[in-house]
């Protein structure tokens, strides 16, 4: 797998990635900067694009409490409860799979709008559902909308962000997921005292509001410059880059780099193989990208974070809390912790790097999950056991939020080359959603078989395997452009856990083979 050739006759099939820049560098144009408002503009775009992520977070948070009242109002069974909770993650894979093709066809921006409209429809149906069957129909639609949203937001943000700030900005969707979870917990507590046939409907209906704001926000934000280059709309792409990058010289260099990566100078080179064929029959470099991207997405979920968040009332009830109001109050503490530590990650991700934070996250989660298993197994139904269980749950979500939570979205959106980015990110999102759905749809059944404490021992073992995966399969990508990261995966040595290998801007002179 490699970048496209320049397409000049008589040239070798090996090309310097920076060969298209040389003439521009010799012009010695005076450099202009337009830093006034640039950072604020990029920040605003990242925030608006992340509003779809609030939908997923809100659903996770609100369903943990709403399900208590849905069970009472609609008289659903435990199996129906598991299906209702977990089906959204499973069905969202349809949106994630379709999201790659859709975003390449209509653009990143309008794919986000499409996602918001589908979710609004589903949320409206859930709010008015008179039966379990109608509730499931609404949940299926909401899941498809969320699948589109969680796939496209990180891609869009990565493609408009300057390299130096991309890590922090691309983690915004995870921040907004956490914010949505907290809003869901607060909504549960705030409306829990309404009549049982009304409270859960209000809880679910409030989730429509973020998607309404997103539709208005799309009037403001621009299309992705990389998508515009793929559509041969170079002038528009440059206009967007001028708004998001401070240096005019860097704008010219970045535009040339994007054109080269997109195969704009010789577009027929990338028509030789369909994108999905390349993903399903990958070269060694693409295979490494898929292992890293899809692997980190799956580990994010199979370490049990959604079980902790969706079923936190069940966990706290097993620890000894009895009343619904106390259960929902304890979940607010979990939501606050999760949101606080995701903000910590934003400040560290481009300073410390991706890999050190992943080590901290996975090792910390392993410790907390093991501690929670011990507490629920041997100290349940005691005042000290309740406090300790809350401590371990909050610790687990804190370590998750400081590393594995945001960084998996950052890595998935930045490691794939432009021509594969949308579809590969969709595959990563599919892995995440399927894993999440399986965990959510089996947690109660597994807990009944091996106890809640035993289930968290299993999660602790899986989390320890995530530490090994980070060491073996995740390279450091801090400070590299999206196009430079592609080169990083061409080197087997650099991919296999060597943090000291840095790809500088000048390293684009490395030779890349065209397949």
Regions found by a protein language model. Give the residues of each.
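Alpha-helical transmembrane bundle of multi-pass membrane proteins
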Residues: 2-246, 253-256, 262-515
